[in-house]
Amino acid sequence: IAETGAGQHGVATAAACALLGLECIVYMGAVDCERQKLNCFRMTEMGAKVVPVQSGSRTLKDAVNEALRDWVTNIRTTHYIIGSAVGPHPFPDIVRDLQSVIGNEARAQMLNQTSGEHGHVTFSNGPGRLPDVVVACVGGGSNAIGMFTAFLGDTHPSKEPAQGHVRIVGVEAGGEHGPWLPDGTETDKHAATLTNGVVGVLHGSRTFLLQTADGQIKETHSISAGLDYPGVGPQHAQLKASGRVEYKFATDSQALDAQRLVSRKEGILPALEPSHAMHTTMELAKTMRPDQIVLVNLCGRGDKDMLHVAKARG
């Protein structure tokens, strides 16, 4: 079994089960089923059973709830392939270690591409350079922890040790306005857990989450299904608490603008999730020198979002 928000993890699980001849059940919030119809169809075409979750906010949190209920009820016959760096131990560690291929490969490629001459850019003939900034979007946090892990212990070679490490930035879903309206009033139309959350327990881990004073989980909002989650992986909570990683947010409209700009300038159609990271990347770039390097994790393709984006654009 698996849970999924954006649907990509569900598709991967369905593909693996089809190859191995295993029964596959994927839990997905009913709202996400509607806005990710393409991935739902891909899963069912590979033989998976997609279960729309109708409880709660009908998004990723509720899909995780149902998957965990299934798993603990049928633990002797069921294996839960969790889709993010959330949940009880050892799930966050398992996901981090498997996703670390993202950061390890990116780090190796960065060092290779910045040694000598590549294309129209000539770098020093020495050993390659690490990026000045690493950026990724954060919902539950799987793609981000996979990217960040490879750089957590690095000090940039162009800096003195006292000046700090490679800068790492996670970008959450700011929803309609971010956690606050223009007049400073708080709003719940977002999923910026690390920006505006408090410490609590969700899905078996102690982390930052969006909850009321009575401890009830708040409903969240994001145009991107994969970031629409009221908690975050506990490793990100620790990285925020330690100050090693900065966490920012981008709103729905900023993500839509970034998606269109990347599509038209690069010929790459990014998913809505990494489009949040792209917005922040472009804002950071305005403050940097031309010779500095930003590494951004474009963790998903936008095909799955096109119907949803078309509706949002009117």
Locations of regions flagged by a protein language model:
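Alpha-helix C-terminal capping segments
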Residues: V11-E23, F148-H156, H279-R289
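Claisen-condensing/thiolase-fold acyl-transfer catalytic domains that form or cleave C-C bonds
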Residues: V138-S142, G146, D252-R313
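Active-site nucleophile and cofactor-binding loops and adjacent substrate-binding regions
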Residues: I1-H9, G56, Q99, V135-G140, ...
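Short beta-strand segments
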Residues: M28, Q54, I81-A85, A136-G139, ...
